[in-house]
Design a protein with these regions (language model features):
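An N-terminal hydrophobic leader/cap segment in hydrolases
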Residues: 303-338
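Generic alpha-helical hydrophobic packing signal
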Residues: 3, 12, 294, 309, ...
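Cap/lid segment of the alpha/beta-hydrolase catalytic domain
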Residues: 327-416
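Beta-propeller folds
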Residues: 1-294, 302-304, 314
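Short, charged, solvent-exposed linker or helix-capping segments at domain edges/interfaces
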Residues: 68-69, 321, 361-362
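Intrinsic-disorder/low-complexity peptide segments enriched for small residues
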Residues: 103, 316-319, 361
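Residue-level recognition of strand-loop junctions within catalytic nucleotide-signaling folds
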Residues: 39, 300, 352-354
Length: 416
């Protein structure tokens, strides 16, 4: 069940279901269009085995109508006792995942741009223009079997295309800012050394990360690479934050708690105020209003079990709207610590202790390493760690060699 709530009055504006699909992401495309990305495990007689079939849905708050975007559902046909299937969207390859991805929004035409594989025998990765009103799609740009990504501007003009061939090992980036396709980057490798993740506000540069440590840019006219532009010592670049058109809005760093780099200094000051107000927790900026006055933030750690709050920057006021775990009465203390391995390498770790300080002496300890191994534990409300501390244990979550989040040295030390 999805609920759309007015942040000011906390009144429910709409509620709806997206069928049997598992929700993966939810966000606003416009003030009245909510995008829901979901998936479910399916099988298809033309495809061996099962795969996670994903879709994007749009919910119109005014009409209260839920519409599927770029539908690859199978329409079965029988002809001469031969079972045939055709996708509901003409020429769309039926057995593919990742169909919920949106890479652009045209506000004037109320259309979104979605990449997908077309063709049955030799599928190629194209871009479709999809109506938010009807969900109907038309092929907008044609790629090839090696195409893996696209970049467009706000009106749908194609700016760049990324190709990678597993057969030849060629990694290619093409620019179309001049009106014609021009090759601006070429490299041969078993896997791409990087992949562009965002585009600049002026549509002139692509941004990418190197070993998750620093952010670099590539000029779309010449292919010149500049950087490092952003980076913090002892932290990975966790995420390049973008809008729906993949324009870079900020850089989020990892570590024990997140930190951000915004292009606007006032935004940096706002986040600094939030992080200082919740010094023992992780503060994530989940979204911002169009005028940038209201921020939706997620606080998790010693100050809350996953609380969502809205910051009114003009009034300097925080309003709680909901919590992930509303019935949690008390939280065991979460400490960010460092200890030395036998060879002197500093290992960052999370130590969680019982809520009662009187019960923190001579505790048995449980080591709870994360999965991955390319992952890391942070200051957050971890239900399993909290459960174990409530039973009288101390819980240590080490970010061992090979863990991400704390810079290249720690991650590289796990390679042996």
């Amino acid at each position: 069940l999805f609920v759309v709530m007015n942040a000011g009055t906390q009144a429910v504006s709409a509620a709806f279901r997206a069928g049997t699909y598992k929700a993966r992401n939810v966000y606003f495309a416009t003030d009245k269009h909510v995008i829901i990305v979901g998936s479910k495990t399916q099988k298809h007689y033309q495809v061996r085995g099962k795969w996670e079939n994903s879709k994007a849905f749009v919910y119109n708050i005014e009409t209260q109508k839920l519409t599927t975007l770029l539908d690859n559902s199978c329409v079965e046909r029988s002809q001469s006792k031969i079972k045939r299937c055709k996708s509901r969207t003409s020429s769309l390859f039926p057995g593919q995942s990742g169909l919920g991805r949106i890479i652009g929004l045209n506000k004037k035409s109320r259309e979104v741009y979605m990449p997908a594989y077309s063709g049955l025998r030799k599928p190629h990765y194209d871009v479709y223009r999809v109506s938010l009103k009807t969900g109907k799609a038309k092929r907008f740009a044609t790629g090839n079997a090696s195409t893996i990504d696209w970049f467009l501007n706000e009106d749908g003009t194609v700016l760049a295309r990324e190709d990678f061939s597993e057969r030849t090992g060629e990694h290619l980036i093409y620019s179309k800012t001049s009106g014609e396709w021009e090759l601006i980057y070429r490299n041969e490798a078993d896997i791409p050394e990087f992949s562009p993740q965002a585009i600049s506000q002026d549509n002139k540069r692509l941004f990418f990360t190197s070993f998750n440590e620093n952010v670099f840019s590539m000029a779309l006219d010449t292919g010149e690479i500049t950087g490092p532009l952003f980076g913090q010592e002892g932290k990975d670049v966790g995420f390049i934050v973008t809008d729906i058109n993949r324009k870079m809005e900020s850089i989020r760093y990892s570590g024990f708690t997140p930190s951000y780099s915004f292009p606007d200094q006032k935004d940096n000051e706002t986040y600094k105020m939030l992080s200082e107000y919740y010094p023992a927790s992780s503060v994530y900026v989940e979204d911002r209003s169009t005028d940038n006055n209201k921020w939706l933030v997620h606080i998790t750690g010693n100050d809350g079990a996953g609380d969502y709050r809205i910051l009114d920057r003009e009034k300097v006021k925080l309003q709680k709207i909901l919590a992930e775990y509303p019935d949690i009465a008390a939280i065991g203390e979460i400490r960010a610590i460092n200890y030395k391995a036998r060879d002197g390498l500093k290992i960052p770790a999370i130590l969680t202790l019982p809520t009662d300080p009187e019960k923190r002496k001579n505790l048995p300890l449980i080591a709870l390493p994360h999965g991955g191994p390319a992952s890391h534990d942070t200051v957050r409300f971890d239900w399993l760690a909290q459960y174990l501390t409530a039973k009288g244990y101390a819980v240590l979550q080490p970010n061992f060699r090979g863990s991400t989040g704390f810079g290249y040295e720690l991650k590289n030390s796990g390679d042996g």
